[in-house]
């Protein structure tokens, strides 16, 4: 199935330039991934599924004008969100050199002027405040909330791409004002920033 069809089946519609950019991303990830071990799953279908996984929450989260993705790795979800939402100021926070080199190469190849890549650990980032903080498969929810405390604004929302241990993490984190949306094996935890 084509990427366009896969996304459209999930109520995600984008202009042609997005799909062209994704073709470049797929090609670059497949080339770099084999050499630098960026991702274990490099078939077109696997990458398309990861792109869908990255974008699916756009169906249910609130609008945002900036976001920071913690531990972007090979580009999921942050780089994909930056490609899809060029109107949004995007920050990818990734400490590993090889992954940062790949992310910078994709940024340059696609001319992503909305994107800033920070080679740091999240807890060491200062002087940045965003509307939305995302993370996929980095660590537990409680630790994510703690290590991102310096980059959140008063009303920052969180979007964490989680697996099966989510109920325990929610209880441990003592969060409120959240919703969980499930798709296949994925649980998306959306913690809405509070407005008083």
Where are the predicted features?
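Class I SAM-dependent transferase core
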Residues: 1-64, 68, 98-115
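Residue-level preference for alpha-helix termini and adjacent loops
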Residues: 13, 37-41, 75, 124, ...
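Conserved active-site region of classical short-chain dehydrogenase/reductase
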Residues: 55, 79, 142
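N-terminal cationic-hydrophobic initiation segments that often serve targeting/anchoring roles
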Residues: 58-59, 82, 149
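Conserved beta-strand/loop positions that form the S-adenosyl-L-methionine
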Residues: 70-72
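Conserved SAM-binding loop of SAM-dependent methyltransferases across substrates and taxa
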Residues: 74-87
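S-adenosylmethionine
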Residues: 88-91, 95-196
